[in-house]
A protein has these predicted regions:
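Feature recognizes metal-dependent phosphohydrolase scaffolds
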Residues: 1-617
């Protein structure tokens, strides 16, 4: 059975890593133990929308997981207030200690008590991982010390207890306790979440997406499912001028000039001066917005005309401005539109566009962040039996997968998302095809785009006074994803047939205030729009949802709005979470039930074959 050429060659390669039967046995024992540990905790977030402070807090409290562990350990021994103090210390160790020091609350007894409490929390969180994995997570400067403290055991003569106390006493005496507390707090947060899923839209109206990406850049394990706002910035960084105009317009609309000018070095001065001169608007931001909006519709029109396969001809507006006066469009707001060539930039606009283009494609920090989005991101992800995507899988009015004509072929369902992923990556190479770069704009705003899924009415909202024309029809997906059979159809399309498979979806806010439920299709689909956008909190009634998937099952968490870091430090204010157990596994889920576990089982099988081979020698 194992003597064919393929297996013989494979076994020879395995032997290079395991030089004896004892090496093989040791690895089989190791992997067999690993696959029987509890599954690590997955944390799902979506629609961060550039809101850094709220995002930082939800990352620090791990969607309430830290508080749950602190309560589990200390509920019977320390007060509610002291538990909240400990949680805030874990969330913001440096800032909280500075405040406590000002209040005169820190002394050697406080250090000793706090260090012991933090070690207990770290011990609990590390218990589901191998010692090797925990060691890899330890901060290098304290790795040996923390490893000793986490694994100190009581013995008959209390030797280990004395050893433990002496380590902590020495740290305090050497005045290194602050840094040690910071290191322990970081370890606790790292152990609380094994893997992070960002289900789209790091960017949008919030002004600090750059800070969020800086934080994510160093995160230990994550994936990103691109959102429509992410792909817009990615398209801008690829050099798509329509995407560049959209990015600038969106940030001017929400007065987020800092992310453009300070974070990414995009100068708006020339655009502002042109807008003030051409549109007669004194306010620089409003003038720049007026100018970039007209440039946007010109450039979008060029793309629509060049790509009839986008099926977006109904979005061509500048060649019928006179007709649109009947619905309130003021022709005077388009001073640079030439009736003979309505979609052509004039000379001044073209000069401005070239300079903006150059800044977007050469800006080092923006390119670093976009490269990260490409490296960690994709159109969708199948992970541990769940299907993750931001927007939708486009369907027609009958619920059948809708077709889109790309590069000479029709694509639908999973093949469509795969093709979109391929095109997006092709746009971010040296000397890309113009068609691939053009497609980035379609992904942002195309009615049949899996990332958009609706007809954007940007023109109407900007210029039309009749608000009845502002409604943006959505893809039938959004009316059908309440149906279990429809969601199962999508899951099957992506190769998921297990009863425990789910769709994890972002993109659309859940209006809890109106009784809307984030759980759809009898539990087959979860909408986890994170609700970080402050402007939406009053409309939805909450600050969105996150999802936790640990060894005990799935838990959906609803959040209250975040106030501020200052409030959290002074008053121990947390983002309150209400947790609903959506699915409680009948048995605890182990590593062997995960994607990684299945690969390890395959490795164990191969090692058994190698062991048989050794024993036949």
């Amino acid at each position: 059975m194992y003597n064919d050429k393929g297996n013989t060659k494979y076994l020879k390669l395995l032997k290079q890593n395991y030089s004896s039967s004892q090496d093989v046995i040791r690895e089989i024992v190791n992997l067999s133990a690993i696959i029987n540990l509890p599954k690590g905790t997955e944390f799902f977030l979506s629609d961060i929308h550039g809101e850094y402070e709220a995002f930082l807090h939800i990352m620090n409290n791990c969607s309430g997981v830290i508080k749950e562990k602190v309560d589990l350990i200390f509920k019977e021994t320390i007060s509610d207030y002291d538990r909240q103090e400990l949680c805030t210390l874990i969330y913001y160790p440096r800032e909280k200690m500075a405040l406590l020091d000002e209040q005169g609350k820190i002394d050697s007894d406080w250090y000793a008590m706090t260090l012991n409490q933090l070690i207990l929390v770290a011990k609990l969180l590390s218990s589901k991982y191998t010692r090797s994995k925990v060691r890899k997570a330890l901060p290098k400067e304290y790795a040996y010390i923390i490893d000793e403290l986490l694994h100190a055991q009581e013995d008959e003569d209390a030797n280990q207890v004395r050893y433990h106390k002496q380590i902590l006493k020495t740290i305090i005496d050497l005045e290194d306790a602050d840094e040690f507390i910071i290191a322990l707090s970081a370890l606790i947060k790292r152990l609380a979440v094994d893997h992070l899923h960002i289900v789209g839209d790091v960017f949008d109206r919030g002004g600090s997406a750059d800070k969020i990406l800086d934080l994510l850049y160093d995160y230990h394990s994550l994936d990103i499912e691109w959102g429509n706002h992410d792909i817009l910035w990615m398209g801008a960084a690829c050099g798509n001028d329509a995407c560049i105009c959209n990015v600038i317009r969106n940030n001017l609309k929400y007065n987020n000039v800092e992310i453009l000018e300070n974070a990414y070095g995009i100068s708006l001065r020339q655009l502002m001066l042109f807008g003030m001169k051409t549109y007669g608007i004194e306010d620089g931001i409003e003038a720049a917005r007026a100018a970039i909006t007209v440039m946007l519709f010109k450039l979008e029109g060029q793309l629509i005309l060049a790509h009839p396969e986008y099926e977006m001809g109904n979005r061509l507006m500048l060649d019928r401005l006179d007709d649109l006066q009947d619905v309130g469009v003021d022709r005077k707001r388009f001073p640079t539109v030439d009736d003979e060539r309505p979609y052509a930039l004039n000379d001044e606009e073209a000069v401005i566009m070239r300079k903006l283009h150059r800044q977007f494609v050469t800006g080092q920090r923006l390119q670093k962040h976009v490269r990260f989005l490409y490296d960690k991101g994709s159109m969708y992800n199948v992970y541990n039996g769940n299907l993750l995507y931001h927007g939708c899988v486009p369907v027609d009015s009958n619920g059948a997968f809708d077709k889109l004509y790309i590069d000479g072929e029709f694509y639908h369902g999973r093949a469509l998302l795969d093709k979109c992923d391929e095109k997006a990556r092709a746009a971010y190479v040296d000397n890309p095809y113009k068609d691939d770069v053009d497609f980035m704009w379609f992904l942002w705003g195309g009615e049949k785009s899996p990332l958009c899924g609706r007809m954007l009415k940007t023109f109407e909202m900007e210029y039309v006074t009749d608000k009845s024309m502002w409604e943006e029809p959505s893809n039938p997906y959004y009316s059908r994803y309440y149906d279990k059979s429809f969601c199962c159809q999508i899951l099957h399309e992506f190769g998921l047939y297990d009863d425990d498979a789910h769709i994890i979806n972002g993109h659309t806010p859940v209006h809890a205030i109106e009784g809307e439920n984030p759980v759809r299709a009898n539990g087959k689909l979860f909408v986890i729009d994170g609700g970080f956008c402050r402007a939406m909190n009053k409309k939805t009634g909450i600050a969105g949802y996150t999802l936790i998937y640990n060894s005990h099952g799935l838990r959906l968490k609803a959040h209250t709005p975040f106030t501020s870091v200052e409030d959290a430090l002074i008053n121990n204010t947390d983002i309150e979470t209400s947790s609903e157990v959506e699915e409680n596994d009948k048995r605890r889920m182990l590593v062997k039930d995960t994607d990684i576990g299945k690969r390890l089982i395959g490795e164990i099988d191969d090692l058994h074959k190698l062991l048989e081979n050794y024993r036949r020698l």
